[in-house]
Amino acid sequence: MGYLYPLLIIISIASLILDYLYLISKKSAIEIVNDMGIGYNLGYLFDCYNTSEEIKTPNEQITLWGNSPPNKQLFNFLKKSGFKTIRFPITWMHFMDDSGKVNPLWMSRVKEVVKWIIDANMYCIIDVHNDATDRNWLSEGIASKYKFKYLWEQIANEFLRILMKNIYYLKL
């Protein structure tokens, strides 16, 4: 039952984004999904969590599990290799204050990667990831609903300026 509210927000956001994509592309939701084609998961970079180390900078989180940070060339290579969609899982909890405000350095780093994906003419699926796992901030009850809504407001406000092919969802 605790996931009902976030799920309703997700459905509403997805519906609004698909409506927006239809307006700018004149494609139906089915056509957009079909156009997304083969996807690539950009995992184990921005979604690290549950560590004993304190994470202070975006680069510390991105490299925490031993991976190299992504770069623009990666997305150009993936596009040339036939991928059309990038799933971009992001864990926000290390870069949010108690009210849910996202650290501007983290949002800037996320935005940089999204821009590279869009510049490569690919779809980008932003996935609020690991924040909803057991014992993380999205399991804190009613207070987490407001933080969750505030997080998506920040994401939407940040990316509305560059929104051409972005679809947002939460993995529950």
Task: Please name every model-derived segment.
Residues 92-94, 130-134:
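Active-site-proximal loop/turn and secondary-structure-junction residues that shape catalytic pockets
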Residues 37-42, 85-89, 124-127, 168-171:
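Structural recognition of the beta-strand scaffold that forms the well-ordered cores
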Residues 97-98, 135-137:
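Short Asp/Glu-rich motifs
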Residues 66-83, 102-128, 138-169:
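An active-site-proximal structural segment forming one wall of the substrate-binding cleft
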Residues 2-6:
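Feature marks short, highly hydrophobic, charge-poor N-terminal signal-anchor/signal peptide-like helices
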Residues 19-85:
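N-terminal carbohydrate-binding accessory modules
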Residues 8, 12-16:
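Single-pass alpha-helical transmembrane signal-anchor segments in small membrane proteins across taxa
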Residues 83-104:
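Aromatic-lined carbohydrate-binding/catalytic grooves of carbohydrate-active enzymes
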